[in-house]
């Protein structure tokens, strides 16, 4: 893609998200969502093939439907209260429709079906943007309207997302689909705690973006898109095999890695609110995610694909400069659990 066009598209994507995040007027929020959606579609179609076109079309239809529901909720609320302000969402029907629209944009169950299909059909770089940056705008609006959200509806969607994110990834061999199901599960954890402690949702989001970005960068460095290609990683870049192992386990939420921090804090916060059954279900379903990450870990570092002797020295010709950006990301996504008690005290 032409660098000038790519720069324009990226600027529009960023601008659309920032408009949503900084607006207190529903019409501006809707405009920001539309700008963001229309700008990211060419990024999804960077590779000119039928699969990427199909993925972009699915993304467009889903996001357009969500935008229609969002505008319907805004108009219902306007008829009820006469207000365009985001904080003035008092109509229960409008609140319910708004929650459906935003969860559809996020990819929460039962509106999650588009996430694995779209992620699988696009390049790794576009998948990274889709699963990280594109979550910021809907989560910001959910954060803003959290006092007026139907608690039962959101918790049901969240628990379903955690369970589906775990079950869906079990049989997958495509790394992009696995990351998509992981995203669904992480969104479930974030929206569960949104009602009780919105600040913790933001902390969870930052950690999720760090871990997901690190994982996608590792996949792009080793050109891996399937579990089979992960077994070739030790030939190409043996130095990052151990790093990949730690990052995968961190993404699965295994202590003492960074990924355990949000789960620990969320379970503790729910328990403080005398909610015992909910964190128990969440902790059990989180084991499903950990299981398929353990499978990836096994494929990455504990198996060796049959190769010739010439293949075994291929890593010597790789350019180590590409790994320079990965270093701080790896440290942050695996080794930031120790400050957790201090964060809990400050919170």
From Swiss-Prot:
Keyword Nucleotide-binding belongs to the record: no
Family: Belongs to the complex I subunit 2 family.
Transmembrane segments: 13-33, 59-79, 96-116, 122-142, 149-169, 178-198, 200-220, 240-260, 276-296, 325-345
GO molecular function terms attached to this record: NADH dehydrogenase (ubiquinone) activity
Record-linked InterPro entries: Complex_I_Subunit_2, NADH_DH_su2_C, NADH_UbQ_OxRdtase_chain2, ND/Mrp_TM
Key words of the record: Electron transport, Membrane, Mitochondrion, Mitochondrion inner membrane, NAD, Respiratory chain, Translocase, Transmembrane, Transmembrane helix, Transport, Ubiquinone
Name by which UniProt lists this protein: NADH-ubiquinone oxidoreductase chain 2
Enzyme class: translocase
A Pfam family reported for this protein in Swiss-Prot or TrEMBL: Proton_antipo_M
Reaction catalysed by this enzyme: a ubiquinone + NADH + 5 H(+)(in) = a ubiquinol + NAD(+) + 4 H(+)(out)
Location(s), subcellular: Mitochondrion inner membrane
UniProt-listed Enzyme Commission number(s): 7.1.1.2
Function summary: Core subunit of the mitochondrial membrane respiratory chain NADH dehydrogenase (Complex I) which catalyzes electron transfer from NADH through the respiratory chain, using ubiquinone as an electron acceptor. Essential for the catalytic activity and assembly of complex I.
Main subcellular location of this protein, as a coarse class: mitochondrion
Subunit structure: Core subunit of respiratory chain NADH dehydrogenase (Complex I) which is composed of 45 different subunits. Interacts with TMEM242.
UniProt superkingdom: Eukaryota
One annotated GO biological process: mitochondrial respiratory chain complex I assembly
Membrane topology, as annotated: Multi-pass membrane protein
Any one GO cellular component localisation term in the record: mitochondrial inner membrane
């Amino acid at each position: 893609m032409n660098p000038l066009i790519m720069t324009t598209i990226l600027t529009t994507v960023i601008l659309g998200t920032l408009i949503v995040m900084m607006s207190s007027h529903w019409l501006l929020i809707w405009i920001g969502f539309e700008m963001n959606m229309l700008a990211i579609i060419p990024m999804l179609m960077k590779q000119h093939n039928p699969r990427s076109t199909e993925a972009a079309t699915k993304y467009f239809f889903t996001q357009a439907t969500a935008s229609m529901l969002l505008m319907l909720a805004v108009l219902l609320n306007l008829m009820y209260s006469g207000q365009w302000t985001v904080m003035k969402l008092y109509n229960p029907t409008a609140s319910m429709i708004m929650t459906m629209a935003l969860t559809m944009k996020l990819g929460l169950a039962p509106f999650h079906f588009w996430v694995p299909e779209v992620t699988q059909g696009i390049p790794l770089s576009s998948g990274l943007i889709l699963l990280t940056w594109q979550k910021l705008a809907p989560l910001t609006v959910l954060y803003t309207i959290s006092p007026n959200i139907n608690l039962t509806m959101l918790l049901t969607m969240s628990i379903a997302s955690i369970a589906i994110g775990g079950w869906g990834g079990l049989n997958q061999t495509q790394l992009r689909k696995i990351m998509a199901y992981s995203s669904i599960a992480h969104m479930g954890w974030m929206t569960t705690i949104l009602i009780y402690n919105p600040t913790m949702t933001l902390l969870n989001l930052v950690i999720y973006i760090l871990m997901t970005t690190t994982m996608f960068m590792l996949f792009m460095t080793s050109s891996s898109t399937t579990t089979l290609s992960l077994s070739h990683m030790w030939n190409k870049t043996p130095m990052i095999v151990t790093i990949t192992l730690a990052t995968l386990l961190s993404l699965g939420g295994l202590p003492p890695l960074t990924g355990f921090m949000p789960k620990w804090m969320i379970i503790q916060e729910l328990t403080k609110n005398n909610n015992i059954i909910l964190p128990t279900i969440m902790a059990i379903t989180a084991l499903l995610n950990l299981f398929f990450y353990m499978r990836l870990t096994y494929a990455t570092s504990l198996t060796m694909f049959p190769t010739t002797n010439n293949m075994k020295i291929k890593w010597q010709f790789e350019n180590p400069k590409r790994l320079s950006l990965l270093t701080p990301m790896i440290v942050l996504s695996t080794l930031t659990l120790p400050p957790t008690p201090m964060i809990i005290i400050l919170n």
